[in-house]
């Protein structure tokens, strides 16, 4: 499981690099500066939580056989958070349809849950 988590976190971080470059170079003449900022916020949070998923993977590697379900839940929540939070910001910026706005806080909630599960693992 740890290797899969490391693979997914690396792919997610790599995708964030691609999306960040796209925001900086490919979107300048296509969407407003405000929407580019929204898009880049999605990129930032995707980066942060890609690294968080890597921390989960490393924690599983350090723990050896003593693998915690809390870490698995942390990984799942970080992944869902990226999809909902960053994904909704990408869609909002690209389509400018406000319907995607309410999805963003749900992603934020999953980020918070991920950090709670990650923290609980280390205090148990």
Set out the residue ranges of the language-model regions:
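Polytopic transmembrane helical bundles with strong interfacial aromatic enrichment
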Residues: 1-124
